[in-house]
Amino acid sequence: MDYSRCCGSTNSRVIYMNIDEKWQNAWERDHVFEPKIDERKKFMITVPWPYTNGSLHVGHGRTYTLGDIIARYKRSRNYNVLFPMGFHQSGTPILAFSERIRAGDASTIALYRSYLSEYGEKDIDGWLEKFKDPRNIADYFSNAIINDFKHLGYSIDWTRKFTSADEFYQNVVKWQFHKLNEKGLIKQDKYPILYSIDDDNAVGEDDIKDGDTDKVSVEEYTAVFFESNSYSLIAASLRPETLFGVTNIWINPTGEYVKIKIGDKIAVVSKEAVDKLKYQRNDVSVIGPISAESIQRKKFTTPFGKEVPVYKADFVDTDNGTGVVYSVPSHSVYDFVYYRRKKSGQTPVVIEAPLKMPEVEIKFDLNSKEGLDEATKELYKSEFYYGKLVNSGEYTGLTVRDAREKIKKDLIGSGKAIIFYETSRKAVTRGGSKVIVAVLPDQWFIDYSADWLKKLSHDMLNRMMIYPEMYRNVMNDAIDWLKERPCARRRGLGTKLPFDDRWVIESLSDSTIYPAVYTTSIQMRKLYENGKLDENAIERIFDGGEVQNDEERTARNEFSYWYPVDIRLTAVPHISNHLSFYVMNHAAIFPPEKWPSGLIISGLVVSNGAKISKSKGNVVSLLEITKKYSADIYRLYVAVQADVSSTMDWNENDLSNIVRRFNEFKTIMDSFKPDTSELNFEETWFVSRFAERLKQFMDQMDGFQIRDAYINIFYGTLNDLKYAVNRGASQNRSLASIIADWLRALMPVISHHAEEYWHRYVSNTYVSINPFDDNFAEKYERLAKVYGLSTSEFYQVMDYVEHIIQDINNIISVTGIEPKSVEITVANEDVIKASREFLSNSVSERSKRYLQYLAKRRKDIVVYPFNEIDILRRNSSYISRQVKADVSINTGDIINGKIAVPGKPVIHIT
């Protein structure tokens, strides 16, 4: 790309990077972000620890940057802030990638070559050899991410760092699972689970490609036997209530089908379905292949005795369900379209609902996939929520909801159907292995369906600060939805299940209460190294009891002071898994006073309008960010490009605008020469305007409106300064009065440059930990009082002046006059008094002569706290320049039949 187009000259980028590196080194050298317990109010913020199977990109960076902005802002408000970080090294993805490198998989090796090349490694082959051990992948990228985070200026306390592979942490996870088991939440039973055939292992969201943003779940189908005189066809459906409306069966003419023995029945399914059935049942065996043509020659009978033909349809996916589909044209849009090509006439209607197929045909475009999908969604919704069965034998009159469950139960009970599980979408693991649903006979899971646990979780959410508020109901719904969750696998990296070490605790279940360990990691590590971190010690630290040694005592104090987490910040895809497990495990294990206090859910990130992926070529790594743009420019982009809850689009065209304003800021600051002499009127207006902006900024930041806050305090202040200077203010005098507080406000976002200018112009302390004065507003009020105004009154002054200028220009535009002089007549004291009386409905005899005029201009009357004539005379030269005419300013009442009212002078142009 053309760097100069978005980032200025190469020399500018070098200067930025030198400043970045200078202050990153200083912060680390002086342990600036390693807080100790003190008398201040504490604030603990956590962001999900990164998974260490590769480099992080611009999308990941948004979440961590937002977390750092909030942490830094809280320091500026004199909170004792802990912002810790660790690394997630559990699960199967790291192991799978390592195995693929060991097996010589070309695509995996190419991927890791690109990672290593980006990090500037010379001995790439040597590193690839090391990556055959999965622990080396995890450790390499943990260290790489630390460097990425440091280069972005994150104010993380790295002394508390640990990983999910650390043995002391695994002791904590074992303690956690014993606690869950004691509460009856750990179960072992037959259970359907997402499964990788190649890896021979259960998988979860963290293991599946795009599993966090494009969820994959287990769906339960009713697989129905359609019988003939020699074998059955098995057709799987989510809607058994439509069986009375079947007209035919669809199969794919080019698909491969297989005859199998399932229980005591002979049946036919697609070749792909055989593997799925084998992983779900132990009574399936293959007899042999069967052609689509031979299937089509037969007729089959529904479970309710209706004989139906078999038709070919290329829309049938043999890798979805059983590869056999029964057709209900009156209640399936795709069936309707395809059936109409084969047959004409009426088809049986078995569900009465508001939306019917004839209306669907009119309302939606059934010639496009988008139209078909939209129509399908609307029809299913109408029938599910409002439909009742008709022409359906004994089930007639039942609602769709009730009929679905009853028909399913009856069919399975009579041996005419079985349960079949399928993934909600096609999925592969991060390593590329196909994901199916398997039923494991001895699966371990956490039972999240317990009523007492759901109640505690709802109690937690209802007392928690959640931003945006709209996600409170979403979180409560997610808690209600959760049932049993598989928590262990046969292979992978991580902690052994304490009561069955053949199993490894899966990666979403070993990372739920880990924020508590940040508070105690230093002491727990020492206890473990000394052989003293057993479950009793962990219990004493987290759950009370008499401590046994100084390390336990210190750990207990750290936990008591820092916990709970005040803000957990994560992205919206984590609601249904990470966040729900986080809430419910805290509810199960900790008392209410240690429950998380707040939750911020950020939006997604796209790049140039598209989902970020290597295949689209729009992945920008965090390392690339700091090399191309500098940390502060990226941080500013994250802050102002989108609201926290909105989708952020990483777009270099937008970046160029931010760089331009950032360079404007740098030019102003680099040329600044402090001047503390007395302020004139325009400079006092600027300072007062800043004071009001600063109050607004704090309110916005306290409400996590980060975008609005920095548009206000960064862009707004730059604009105000330019405006004031154009009106006669000294840039140096104006800045001198606000520079310390402006840099404090900018520090959370443009952290490195704020630190640079703080040291250059303010103090040798660190602005990163130099909070605002609690009484910061008083100094600005003192400056404003020189002119007899408060800062809020000064804030209105220039708005008033600009409105007068706008009124003059409007008159010029409407009349077409080329003005030579403008006479502005401001309401005199009599009119001002009369206006106040008029607005309060108590008009004196003296004021009644103005009553008819005031009544006509009621909406124009604004009684300002300042003297209008004084303000306009002070600004007469400016007004004259703006309207390009001589300006005179007087007071009066009624001029040529018009009254000058407070806030709206009479303007006469010649």
Swiss-Prot record:
Motif ('KMSKS' region): 611-615
EC number, UniProt record: 6.1.1.4
HAMAP family the record matches: Leu_tRNA_synth_A (MF_00049_A)
One cellular component (GO) term of this entry: cytoplasm
Species, as recorded: Thermoplasma volcanium (strain ATCC 51530 / DSM 4299 / JCM 9571 / NBRC 15438 / GSS1)
Location of this chain's protein in the cell: Cytoplasm
A single MF term (Gene Ontology): aminoacyl-tRNA deacylase activity
Biological classification of the source: Archaea, Methanobacteriati, Thermoplasmatota, Thermoplasmata, Thermoplasmatales
NCBIfam families on file: leuS_arch, PRK12300.1
Enzymatic reactions: tRNA(Leu) + L-leucine + ATP = L-leucyl-tRNA(Leu) + AMP + diphosphate
Family that this chain belongs to: Belongs to the class-I aminoacyl-tRNA synthetase family.
GO biological process, one term: leucyl-tRNA aminoacylation
Motif segment ('HIGH' region): 50-60
Principal subcellular localization: cytoplasm
Binding site for ATP: 614
Protein name as annotated: Leucine--tRNA ligase
Pfam families: Anticodon_1 (PF08264), tRNA-synt_1 (PF00133)
Lineage top rank: taxon: Archaea
Keywords assigned: Aminoacyl-tRNA synthetase, ATP-binding, Cytoplasm, Ligase, Nucleotide-binding, Protein biosynthesis
